[in-house]
Structure formats: C-alpha cells, structure tokens
Amino acid sequence: MGRGRVELKRIENKINRQVTFAKRRNGLLKKAYELSVLCDAEVALIIFSNRGKLYEFCSSSSMLKTLERYQKCNYGAPETNVSTREALELSSQQEYLKLKARYEALQRSQRNLLGEDLGPLSTKELESLERQLDVSLKQIRSTRTQYMLDQLTDLQRKEHMLNEANKTLKQRLLEGTQVNQLQWNPNAQDVGYGRQQAQPQGDGFFHPLECEPTLQIGYQPDPITVAAAGPSVNNYMPGWLP
C-alpha cells in the first residue's frame, strides 16, 4: 500500500520546523546541483529562512549574471521593460498618494475627537462628530459596567467560598472541643448513671422501717400482753424436767 496524501501546512512546533527546514533545504540544494550537472542547465536557487538568513546556489560563475538573464527574459525587450517600469512607478505613486490621504484623514479625525481643530467643521460634521462621541461613550460605559459586574460576581463567589470554609472550621472546632471534654472527664457519664440507679435502691431499703415501727431499737413490749401470753407458755413442759 502506498502512502496517503499528506496535508501541507505550517509546522507549529518550533524545533520540528527548524529540523524540517534544514533537511528540506539540503535536499533542495542537492537536487539543484544534480539538475545542473545531469542536464547541463543553468540553475539559480535563493532561500531565505524565517530568521532572514540567506542560502543560495548558482550553477554559473555569478548569481548576478543569472539574475540579469532572468530579468531580460521576464520583461522582454528594453522598450517593453521601460514601459512596464513606468507603469509600475505610476501605480506605486498613486498608491502612495492614497495612503497619504488616508493617513491625513485619520490624523484629522483623531484631533477632532480630542476637541481640536473644530473651527473648519460645518454643522453637519459637528453633529456627526457628536453622534460618534455618544456611541463611543455608550460603548465605554457598557464595557465599564460589564467589567464591574464581573468583578462583583467574582467577589460574591469568593465571599460564598469563605463563608462555607468558616462554617466548616466552626464545626470542626466544636467537635474538637467536645472530644477534649470527654478526654479530660471520661467518667462523667458513668457517675451520673450510677447516681440515678442507686437512688431507687435506697428508697426500697428504708421503706420497711416506716411500715414496721416495732422493729425500732429500744422498744419495750406491753407487760399486759406478756402476762396474757404467760399461761400458754407454762402449759408446755419439757420432757427433761422432773
């Protein structure tokens, strides 16, 4: 399979462009030399690099002679050459006059926009100048307003980001404070829980004392009750008595 067509375009990479230029330049000079030797042709080759460096090859003894021969062949006879030169000079002069008039008009317009040299202007020209200034002021104000709005939007975005970061830092600070409190007093919750559980047990322990007052220390039984209970005690005779 043959190679496909390669699109010719400028090489963007500077180093690759320089390397390709050196290779193609040497190849082109070699081809020009081979053409002049093999075919006995008069060949002149002029190359300027992108940096302005000159590379040339001429198969004859002088590049100037080859260029003179080229001019004679290109412009024809001397009469034709003179007429062509005159036409070229006339065209160049006309182009120069046009560019000069354009430059002077731009300079005059710039001075008028700055408020200078307004005396020669007519009423219509002054009105046109005023409209131009109004349009320019509107564009300037619109650009300034848009720039200020963009700055305000950017500041609001930064403010929102700072507020979110502040909230996050406050939350982390609060969590860190709680963790430090638990580390300094790890039994705080256990002590409170023990107190809550011990209170019902104390109430149940002392509750029978209130219901049975006869169990109090230093209580003397009623003698009548003891005397009544005496006969029942005497009716029982142990077996070891005589």
Swiss-Prot record:
Source domain of life is Eukaryota
* Pfam families hit by this protein: K-box (PF01486), SRF-TF (PF00319)
| GO BP term, pick one | flower development
Organism of origin is Vitis vinifera (Grape)
* Principal subcellular localization: nucleus
- Compartments where found: Nucleus
Alphabetized InterPro entries for the sequence: MADS-box/MEF2_TF, MEF2-like_N, TF_Kbox, TF_MADSbox, TF_MADSbox_sf
Q: In which tissues is it expressed?
A: Expressed in flowers and seeds.
Q: Where is the MADS-box domain?
A: 1-61
What is this protein's record name?
Agamous-like MADS-box protein MADS4
Q: Does the keyword DNA-binding apply?
A: yes
Function description: Probable transcription factor involved in flower development.
Gene3D superfamilies listed in its UniProt record = Transcription factor, MADS-box (3.40.1810.10)
Please give an example of a GO cellular component term from this record: nucleus
Asked if the keyword Nucleus belongs to this entry, the reply reads: yes
What keywords appear on the UniProt entry? DNA-binding, Flowering, Nucleus, Transcription, Transcription regulation
What region holds the K-box domain?
A: 89-185
GO terms for MF: DNA-binding transcription factor activity, RNA polymerase II-specific; protein dimerization activity; RNA polymerase II cis-regulatory region sequence-specific DNA binding
